[in-house]
Design a protein with these regions (language model features):
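Short, 15-30-residue, compositionally biased linear elements
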Residues: 341-353
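A short beta-strand motif that forms part of the nucleic acid-binding face
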Residues: 224, 365, 374-375
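Short Cys/His-rich micro-motifs in 6-15 aa windows
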Residues: 359, 372-383
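Compact nucleic-acid interaction/catalytic patches
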Residues: 348, 379-380, 384, 421
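Alpha-helical structural context detector biased toward long hydrophobic helices
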Residues: 1-6, 12-344, 388-451, 455-459, ...
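Short Cys/His-rich zinc-binding micro-motifs
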Residues: 350-368
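C-terminal helical accessory/scaffold domains
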Residues: 472-475, 479-485
Length: 805
């Protein structure tokens, strides 16, 4: 079978929809024709116009072909796009027609085809490449398939209109990137439109244009903008902007009442032409130059593209459905599955905020030190409660539920923790973090702040050492919240439905939260929820990626032993010590039958003393009367999500997990298979020093508030900025930072060596590869999440190692 190597990225069946009757050729215009330098020095422009059949238009040799040595593989063209085009052709024909039953039958295929058409063009493939550090042809084809249907949900939830050119003498043209994105606030020369970018379809003012043939053009418009175009910020994200999720929409809701004039069709053609990559085509030559027939003004095109106001009744509103099993489904106009929590909103007038007032983002910092000099899209949201503010609400609620504000102590909580309290705490947590939360709107954006994301065992006994203990060395530390979100978990494991099984875990989570609360209040620690709670597709992909990766790296033996010791200790505390005295006595007698009654009593008394002294031990001997306890070992975020969150927030990565460190080492950027470490002299110098940490959170907090280790922190921050900015005079930067580090280290160590309580020594191993840490799977997660402001890699990682006394 001959190989298909001339790949039509705009299929011929689609091109034929733009041919005039009794014609089989198109006028084909090259917007950027090749030039040739003559021997005499003159430069001439090659021919920019041709009249060609569809077979010679909009194709590129080996655009989808993959090579394995001398073997040529054309399966992407034949099997993937062959099927897509077959289904897409039927779907497009259905929506050119007016049979509503055909619309319903082909609805999903129609949207899927448009999405595939958007990413299969040279511009679409370049857009995919832009999101990855380096993609070969095979990887590019894999990633292209992995992100299909990325835009379908937001398109289907918007206003859908098909405008007609049947009464116009001018018809729609075809371009080399037919799925065209328009936002009146993002002109072609703006940062949003720098090739190969388009404004995100999640922005309120963004509209999508797709000519179905020369007589019909599909326009998608976001609902908020369509209903109130003059009072919406066009570059602000729409409500519930998550790209990949389930949604329920009407399949018959299409506006088809508008017949456009010549001027209006030419205006749409001008948009299509301006956003094309290189080639456009039309059955008549004059249609290739719409700018000659109109007054070109990018912003005013919005008037032509807005759907008629009297037809918008078909879109929006609330949707209720009942299934055969009696269960129900709810969805609002934006795809949210529960009513909006108005108590999470806040209204702040920026004009009334002074330089020294608290910043409107809720960070707890002064406005002048936080958002004052940032653009709006570089800030965390000012419209809803921040992560910090929600944590403070949660803390106040816990104080009230557990009675701390009425004199109750931690010892009382260990004795009295009840199912009702567990339910109330998790209900409060769930109300603060509804599953439709836009977490990317709340997480900090990349800037010159030295943020550090901790990834490791989330347990109050381990987090104390380095995650909290390193607070004086970094501007802000991000730690993932261990609380279970009741809105995002199977009912069998829901703490609101089955609270008893969470008693022991609740105690651990509460103690950790109490340790962290003063750091959260001061803005030193950002205690963020699991992003997967708000995006089940993200969670599913993360799990699948972790399964694929798990076979590459085994769990570190030293770490496994350490985790098993913790697990055994917890198991002992959760079982034997939480039984009634008589049952404990019987268990000891069964395990050690040679002990006398006196020895058994002495052993039980010793166990009881240890149990009383353990702050993580429940002091209830009826725990197992209602069932067992759920034991959780949470090493979060995992490898993929650690890179993901670090890139979203512009953080470096901190870990004390040997396994996670091995995973990070494997993720160093490699050029031609080789890792480059230009900062190795500096990182070796840092690794040779002993750093002071404290296992007492109060001592760590006092040190941080006193400005402790500020000189070292400043140098670390400057190193981070240097690495991110990838400065040319690297050798000079390394030498300068080495001198600054030694001076600041000696100064701070001398000052705080005897000031901190419960001190221990540790090492920080910095790993700073050129190109940072990157992983294709994480880049895909970022692309599909809709994140707009993330960095392309994680510049640095730090491994903490405890030193023997």
């Amino acid at each position: 079978m001959p190989k298909t190597r001339d790949n039509h990225y705009v299929p011929q069946w689609y091109q034929r929809g733009f041919l005039l009757e009794y014609s089989n050729q198109l006028h084909y215009l090259d917007l950027n024709p090749d030039t040739k330098k003559l021997p005499d020095g003159r430069i001439i422009t090659m021919n920019d116009r041709n009249i060609w059949p569809t077979s010679r238009c909009f194709y590129q040799t080996d655009l989808y072909t993959t090579f394995f040595g001398e073997y040529i593989n054309d399966e992407i063209e034949r099997r993937l796009f062959g099927k897509i085009d077959d289904i897409g052709a039927r779907a497009v024909r259905a929506f050119i027609g007016e049979d509503i039953s055909e619309w319903h039958r082909h609805f999903s295929d129609f949207f899927s085809y448009i999405d595939s058409q958007k990413i299969r063009t040279p511009k679409g493939l370049d857009w995919i490449r832009k999101h990855y550090p380096r993609l070969g042809q095979v990887d590019l084809m894999l990633e292209m398939q992995a992100i299909r249907n990325l835009h379908c949900t937001l398109w289907s939830e918007g206003v859908r209109e098909i405008v007609s050119a049947k009464k116009s003498d001018v018809k729609f043209i075809i371009t080399d990137h037919p799925v065209t994105i328009y936002n009146y606030a993002c002109s072609p020369d703006s940062q949003y439109c720098v090739y190969p970018n388009d404004p995100s379809i999640a922005l309120k003012g963004t509209q999508t244009l797709f000519p179905l043939n020369y007589d019909n053009c599909l326009i998608f418009t976001n609902l908020e903008y369509a209903k109130n175009p003059n009072n919406q910020n066009p570059i602000e994200k729409r409500t519930n902007a998550q790209l990949v999720r389930d949604s329920m929409v009407r399949t018959d809701a299409f506006i088809r009442s508008r017949n456009l004039t010549d001027y209006e069709v030419s205006s749409i053609n001008a948009i299509l032409k301006k956003r094309a990559r290189r080639y456009i085509a039309a059955p008549k030559k004059d249609w290739l130059f719409p700018e000659t027939d109109i007054s070109y003004d990018w912003a005013t095109f919005k008037k032509i593209l807005l759907p008629p106001e009297n037809e918008l009744y078909q879109f929006g509103g609330e949707l209720f459905a009942k299934y055969e099993d009696g269960s129900t489904y709810y969805q609002d106009a934006f795809g949210r599955k529960r009513p909006e929590n108005k108590y999470l909103k806040k209204t702040i007038e920026i004009k009334k905020i002074g330089r020294n007032d608290y910043c409107g983002c809720g960070s707890g910092k002064k406005y002048k030190k936080c958002c004052m000099n940032k653009k709006e899209d570089e800030r965390s949201s000012w419209q809803v409660l921040s992560i910090r503010e929600r944590n403070l609400v949660l803390y106040n609620g816990i104080e009230d539920i557990l009675g701390f504000n009425k004199g109750k102590t931690w010892g009382d909580t260990r004795k009295e923790l009840s199912n009702e309290q567990i339910i109330k705490i998790h209900e409060l947590y769930g109300s603060l973090w509804p599953t439709d939360t836009d977490i990317f709107n709340l997480l900090p954006k990349p800037d010159k702040t030295l943020r550090a994301l901790y990834t490791g065992l989330i347990d109050p006994r381990t987090v104390l050492l380095f995650a909290i203990g390193s607070a004086p060395y970094f501007d802000e530390i991000l730690i993932q919240h261990p609380f279970i979100n009741p809105g995002a978990v199977n009912p069998k494991f829901n703490p609101v439905k089955s609270p008893h099984q969470y008693k022991q875990q609740m105690l651990k989570n509460l103690l950790l939260f109490l340790y962290l609360q003063p750091f959260i209040e001061q803005g030193f620690i950002n205690f963020f929820p699991d992003p997967c709670c708000f995006d089940l597709y993200l969670q599913r992909e993360m799990f699948d990626m972790a399964k694929q990766r798990r076979g590459l790296i085994k769990m570190n033996e030293q770490e496994t032993d350490r985790l098993m010791k913790i697990h055994k200790k917890d198991h002992f505390a959760n079982t034997l010590c939480n039984l009634s005295k008589e049952r404990r006595r019987n268990q000891v007698r069964k395990a050690m039958p040679d002990l006398s009654s006196k020895q058994i009593e002495e052993l039980l008394q010793y166990m009881e003393r240890q149990h009383q002294e353990d702050p993580l031990a429940l002091l209830q001997d009826d725990v197992f009367d209602e069932g067992g306890q759920l034991t959780m070992i949470s090493m979060v975020p995992n490898f993929e999500m650690a890179l993901f969150i670090a890139q979203v927030t512009g953080s470096i990565i901190l870990t004390d997990s040997e396994t996670r460190w091995e995973e990070l080492v494997r993720a160093q950027f490699r050029k031609n298979g080789v890792v480059s470490l230009p900062w190795v002299d500096l990182s070796d110098m840092i690794a040779n020093q002993k750093f002071i940490f404290s296992s007492d959170p109060h001592s760590t907090l006092c040190t941080r508030m006193d400005g402790g280790f500020g000189s070292v922190r400043k140098v670390f921050r400057e190193i981070y900025v240097d690495v991110r900015e990838n400065k040319n005079n690297l050798d000079t930067s390394v030498e300068r930072r080495k001198k600054e580090f030694l001076a600041s280290y000696e100064k701070d160590i001398k000052k705080y060596n005897k000031k901190m309580n419960y001190c221990f020594n540790g090492k920080m191993n910095f790993l700073i590869p050129k190109g940072g840490f990157v992983f294709n799977n994480t880049q895909r997660l970022l692309l599909k999440s809709g994140s707009e402001k993330h960095v392309n890699n994680v510049p640095m990682a730090v491994f903490f190692k405890l030193l023997a006394p």
